[in-house]
Amino acid sequence: MERSNSIELRNSFYGRARTSPWSYGDYDNCQQDHDYLLGFSWPPRSYTCSFCKREFRSAQALGGHMNVHRRDRARLRLQQSPSSSSTPSPPYPNPNYSYSTMANSPPPHHSPLTLFPTLSPPSSPRYRAGLIRSLSPKSKHTPENACKTKKSSLLVEAGEATRFTSKDACKILRNDEIISLELEIGLINESEQDLDLELRLGFA
């Protein structure tokens, strides 16, 4: 009888310990309640700016503050770049650079005949042709409109690279063998023209 009482006493003790308000699982819940009191972290966390050591209560506020430092650094770079003449050239090419001088002298590892056209501004009287094929013959852009609008266009003749003046370009546009590819954005509507981008070798 005493043995059964001691077993009951042990079970009741361990049972209470498991359901005690200070058990391990309840301590975690209590700790979580302490960390997030009324939806806010407690104690409040602070985020420190690495440049000026100013502290912020949220990561979003720190991010907005870092944008100010980015603008300041950009201004500093712009002010320093004209004063220093021996700075290395940037890795990005200048979009306003004229490539016509580079196109006239081929690189050492390529053959003299290059398939790339000379990139000239629209006012330039000369054009170099490459191998480009087929715009739809249903084009609403007539040769007269192409000459009137001062759009930059590549004039292509089958396989032969030639140079034209702007007067010759209008004459050649009337020829069925020449295809004009307008380089202006938004000039070709998908519903009006269909561009064939298939690569072909030799003459078609």
Curated annotation (Swiss-Prot):
<feature type="region of interest" description="Leucine-zipper-like">
    <location>
        <begin position="153"/>
        <end position="204"/>
    </location>
</feature>
<keyword id="KW-0804">Transcription</keyword>
<dbReference type="GO" id="GO:0090691">
    <property type="term" value="P:formation of plant organ boundary"/>
</dbReference>
<dbReference type="GO" id="GO:0042127">
    <property type="term" value="P:regulation of cell population proliferation"/>
</dbReference>
<dbReference type="GO" id="GO:0003677">
    <property type="term" value="F:DNA binding"/>
</dbReference>
<dbReference type="InterPro" id="IPR036236">
    <property type="entry name" value="Znf_C2H2_sf"/>
</dbReference>
<dbReference type="GO" id="GO:0030154">
    <property type="term" value="P:cell differentiation"/>
</dbReference>
<dbReference type="Pfam" id="PF13912">
    <property type="entry name" value="zf-C2H2_6"/>
</dbReference>
<dbReference type="GO" id="GO:0008361">
    <property type="term" value="P:regulation of cell size"/>
</dbReference>
<keyword id="KW-0678">Repressor</keyword>
<keyword id="KW-0287">Flowering</keyword>
<feature type="zinc finger region" description="C2H2-type">
    <location>
        <begin position="47"/>
        <end position="69"/>
    </location>
</feature>
<comment type="function">
    <text>Probable transcriptional regulator considered as cadastral protein that acts indirectly to prevent the B class homeotic proteins APETALA3 and perhaps PISTILLATA from acting in the gynoecial whorl. Principal function is to balance cell proliferation in the third and fourth whorls of developing flowers thereby maintaining the boundary between stamens and carpels. May fulfill this role by repressing genes implicated in cell division. Plays equally a role in the determinacy of the floral meristem. Is also required for normal ovule development.</text>
</comment>
<dbReference type="GO" id="GO:0010093">
    <property type="term" value="P:specification of floral organ identity"/>
</dbReference>
<feature type="region of interest" description="Disordered">
    <location>
        <begin position="78"/>
        <end position="115"/>
    </location>
</feature>
<keyword id="KW-0539">Nucleus</keyword>
<dbReference type="GO" id="GO:0005634">
    <property type="term" value="C:nucleus"/>
</dbReference>
<dbReference type="GO" id="GO:0009908">
    <property type="term" value="P:flower development"/>
</dbReference>
<feature type="short sequence motif" description="EAR-like (transcriptional repression)">
    <location>
        <begin position="195"/>
        <end position="199"/>
    </location>
</feature>
<keyword id="KW-0863">Zinc-finger</keyword>
<dbReference type="GO" id="GO:0003700">
    <property type="term" value="F:DNA-binding transcription factor activity"/>
</dbReference>
<keyword id="KW-0238">DNA-binding</keyword>
<keyword id="KW-0862">Zinc</keyword>
<dbReference type="GO" id="GO:0009755">
    <property type="term" value="P:hormone-mediated signaling pathway"/>
</dbReference>
<keyword id="KW-0221">Differentiation</keyword>
<keyword id="KW-0217">Developmental protein</keyword>
<keyword id="KW-0805">Transcription regulation</keyword>
<protein>
    <recommendedName>
        <fullName>Transcriptional regulator SUPERMAN</fullName>
    </recommendedName>
</protein>
<dbReference type="InterPro" id="IPR052426">
    <property type="entry name" value="Plant_dev_regulator"/>
</dbReference>
<dbReference type="InterPro" id="IPR013087">
    <property type="entry name" value="Znf_C2H2_type"/>
</dbReference>
<dbReference type="GO" id="GO:0008270">
    <property type="term" value="F:zinc ion binding"/>
</dbReference>
<keyword id="KW-0479">Metal-binding</keyword>
